Design a protein with these regions (language model features):
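Conserved alpha/beta-domain cores
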Residues: 1-219
Length: 219
């Protein structure tokens, strides 16, 4: 779970990211031809642990973009952003923002796993036993742990927005469809949440309720 994934896989096997990024840019150019609209793809660099990982891959992505632009004789407009999945990333937020990452998304599933050293795939019986013994009251993979993982997210937001107030921040995974978690995200001024398609109606309703409650509390 913790080794050859995300940006690490890209760095070890450069042909993978080259193929993926090239496909994104070529598809964007073709989409512009078909629709007549400007397409701006957003390329995510996942599982960032250090700033150098991000800057290394950012440069490589830019090289692929230039290569495709020359081949297709078409300038590509794109954005590069990062997925935040490791606790360490919370403490280098301002450095990542400074290195021209324009968007960030918290992958709260992996952030929960790496913060608590729990795997959602094989800890079901453990969590059930913990709830039975009142060691925990809720499943942290269903409802965001605001005191642990939530604290990391708050630190990250503060550091990132201190560097750039306009930075776009959001979360993805099933916490994005949990009403209580959405209320927490709204209070911390995240720009968006993402979740499985079947949870989207719940997410929209919960986001609206969270915003209404926030406005009421300010009056």
């Amino acid at each position: 779970m913790l080794w050859t994934r995300g940006c690490r896989l890209w760095i070890l096997h450069h042909e993978i990211y080259q193929m993926q990024v090239r496909a994104i840019f070529e598809a964007a150019i073709e989409a512009e031809k078909v629709t007549g609209k400007t397409i701006v793809p957003e390329v995510m660099v996942p599982l960032i642990m250090t700033v150098k990982e991000f800057t290394f891959l950012k440069q490589k992505i830019e090289e692929v973009a230039e290569e495709v632009s020359k081949k297709k004789k078409k300038k590509i407009h794109y954005l590069i952003w990062s997925m935040i999945e490791l606790p360490q990333a919370a403490f280098i937020a301002w450095k990542l923002v400074k290195e021209w990452a324009q968007f960030f998304s918290f992958w709260t599933n992996d952030l929960t796993q790496t913060t608590k050293w729990l795997s959602r795939d094989d800890t079901g019986s453990l969590l059930q036993e913990y709830k039975t013994k009142w060691i925990i009251s809720k499943d942290p993979f269903v409802h965001l742990d605001e005191e642990g993982v939530g604290e990391l997210i708050e630190i990250w937001i503060q550091k990132a927005r201190k560097e750039d107030e306009s930075i776009k921040l959001g979360i993805c995974w099933e916490h994005g469809g949990d009403p209580k978690s959405i209320d927490f995200f709204n209070k911390n001024n995240l720009n968006y949440v993402s979740c499985s398609p079947y949870r989207v109606p719940i997410a929209r309703l919960s986001a609206a309720q969270a915003e209404i409650n926030e406005e009421k509390s300010e009056k």
